[in-house]
Amino acid sequence: MDPNMMIVKTLSETDCSHDNKLILPRDKVENIVRSTGVPVPRMGIQVEILDNTNSYWVNLRQSQRGYFIGRGWGELRDARNLKAGDVIKLYWQNTKFIFSM
């Protein structure tokens, strides 16, 4: 696994709130964007997150402060019963993120 394609994140209260947004580290996402050549338009891009046997389609977007996963995050968060303090990993492989804890 290429560590440059991995996002490791400790979930915050904001990530687990009803705002349904997962804030991502700007430097990690920009590294993935540079490596893959896949741009993230202002309105976002649909990406798939695989979690064992489940697939979740989410919207990866850019804001003035960085990147976040919006639409679709709440479904994954609730399915995995994620809470603030949990550590998650998103590994970019081909055209999707692979989720792990």
From Swiss-Prot:
Molecular-function GO terms, alphabetical: DNA binding
Look up the DNA-binding region in the UniProt entry and give its residue ranges. Answer: 7-101
Q: Which domain of life is it from?
A: Eukaryota
Instruction: Spell out the InterPro entries in the cross-references.
Output: B3_DNA-bd, B3_domain, DNA-bd_pseudobarrel_sf
Where does the signal sequence lie? none
Cellular-component GO terms for this entry: nucleus
**Keyword field:** DNA-binding, Nucleus, Transcription, Transcription regulation
- Annotated compartments: Nucleus
Any one Pfam family match given in the protein's UniProt record, by short name: B3
Instruction: Cite the PANTHER family for this sequence.
Output: TF-B3 DOMAIN-CONTAINING PROTEIN, TRANSCRIPTION FACTOR B3-DOMAIN FAMILY-RELATED
What is the recorded name of this protein? B3 domain-containing protein At1g08985
Query: Which lineage is the organism of this entry classified under, starting from the top rank?
Result: Eukaryota, Viridiplantae, Streptophyta, Embryophyta, Tracheophyta
